[in-house]
From Swiss-Prot:
Primary location group: membrane
Entry similarity comment: Belongs to the G-protein coupled receptor 1 family. Opsin subfamily.
Region (Disordered) residue spans: 333-354
Gene: rho
Cytoplasmic topological segments: 62-73, 134-152, 225-252, 309-354
Protein's organism: Carassius auratus
Annotated site residues (Plays an important role in the conformation switch to the active conformation) in this chain: 113
GO CC, alphabetical: membrane; photoreceptor disc membrane; plasma membrane
Record protein name field: Rhodopsin
Topological domains, Extracellular: 1-36, 97-110, 174-202, 275-286
Main function: Photoreceptor required for image-forming vision at low light intensity. While most salt water fish species use retinal as chromophore, most freshwater fish use 3-dehydroretinal, or a mixture of retinal and 3-dehydroretinal. Light-induced isomerization of 11-cis to all-trans retinal triggers a conformational change that activates signaling via G-proteins. Subsequent receptor phosphorylation mediates displacement of the bound G-protein alpha subunit by arrestin and terminates signaling.
4Fe-4S among keywords: no
Transmembrane parts of this sequence: 37-61, 74-96, 111-133, 153-173, 203-224, 253-274, 287-308
Lipid addition sites, S-palmitoyl cysteine: 322-323
Positions with biased composition (Low complexity): 334-354
Length: 354
């Protein structure tokens, strides 16, 4: 084996030289240089100072402006809450442990850190699935006369919490476990070992199928159908200027949504699956650290994609930040009017983002 397995940890380095130490008790500077941990801490600090304001502002603006309290925005707020879970439950802890070069909170602290990071990520992922499903139902109309209401939104929020818990809770109760990963200063699901007492193998397979493959299929299907529907609507209206604009806006939004999902999850999932299916293979600590920490950027670009591209929300946000006035009032007003015209042209009030 090219790694060292200990009590509730796996260090990706052979202990043939005897230098490997528990990541709960000793700095792991034999894995990578101290400056690498400092860079990791700086990166987490950047995510904190950007992720917290933009997600908190999302919550505040929605509460401040009554017109934003729509059923669909319940899901967007849930997305912001999930990102805040990642910021407070994962990013702050990881920044602190990175400054010390090891997981200073010990085995007791590894469980809550891994839990909150996993819960926040899964809440965000399943919120995207609910958004994709809502867009498909409203725009493509597979069920005639369907209107996305408050009850549907509440059901969607409850669904995201339920699915997130079905992934984050099992490692706390004995189905798999949370252990330090990569550079040993953050905790995640154990892809590295297969102790019979924890049934890691069955949990990882379950997680990849239910919490990665299925969401990916749903998102691709829903947004694929949405783009096709908008194209068909544009053709039926003889491709008027407003319809073409609507098609471009929706297509751009969908492409960014899908790319964001892929960029966030595929590198991490691919590396985790490789490690899981190549037990004992040689890989360095950075091999898992880079995709794992890159996936955390979802807490920053999620609100940018799903909220900042929403004209109405952007207008309210600028108004809030500028003490009740929007210096871009004319531009925003024209955009809002155009958006309404475009929505009418494609026979759906929900074609433009949210």
């Amino acid at each position: 084996m090219n790694g060292t397995e200990g009590d509730m940890f796996y260090v990706p380095m052979s202990n043939a030289t005897g230098i490997v130490r528990s990541p709960y008790d000793y700095p792991q500077y034999y894995l990578v240089a101290p400056w690498a941990y400092a860079c990791l801490a700086a990166y987490m600090f950047f995510l904190i100072i950007t992720g917290f304001p933009v997600n908190f502002l999302t919550l505040y603006v929605t509460i401040e402006h009554k017109k934003l309290r729509t059923p669909l925005n319940y899901i967007l707020l849930n997305l912001a809450i999930s990102d805040l879970f990642m910021v407070f439950g994962g990013f702050t802890t990881t920044m602190y442990t990175s400054l010390h070069g090891y997981f200073v909170f010990g085995r007791v602290g590894c469980n809550p850190e891994g839990f909150f990071a996993t819960l926040g990520g899964e809440m965000g992922l399943w919120s995207l699935v609910v958004l994709a499903f809502e867009r498909w139902m409203v725009v493509c109309k597979p069920v005639s006369n369907f209107r996305f209401g408050e009850n549907h939104a509440i059901m969607g929020v409850v669904f995201t919490w339920f699915m997130a818990c079905t992934c984050a809770v099992p490692p706390l109760v004995g189905w798999s476990r949370y252990i330090p990963e990569g550079m040993q200063c953050s905790c995640g699901v154990d892809y590295y070992t297969r102790p019979q007492a924890y049934n890691n193998e069955s949990f990882v397979i379950y997680m990849f199928i239910v919490h990665f493959i299925i969401p990916l299929i749903v998102i691709f299907f829903c947004y694929g159908r949405l783009v096709c529907t908008v194209k068909e609507a544009a053709a039926q209206h003889e491709e008027s200027e407003t319809t073409q604009r609507a098609e471009r806006e929706v297509t751009r939004m969908v492409v960014i949504m899908v790319i964001g999902f892929l960029i966030c999850w595929i590198p991490y999932a691919s590396v985790a699956w490789y490690i899981f299916t190549h037990q004992g293979s040689e890989f360095g600590p950075v091999f898992m650290t880079l995709p794992a920490f890159f996936a955390k950027t979802a807490a920053v670009y999620n609100p940018c994609i799903y909220i900042c591209m929403n004209k109405q929300f952007r207008h309210c946000m600028i108004t809030t930040l500028c003490c009740g006035k929007n210096p871009f009032e004319e531009e925003e007003g024209a955009s809002t009017t155009a958006s309404k015209t475009e929505a009418s042209s494609v026979s759906s009030s929900s074609v433009s983002p949210a």
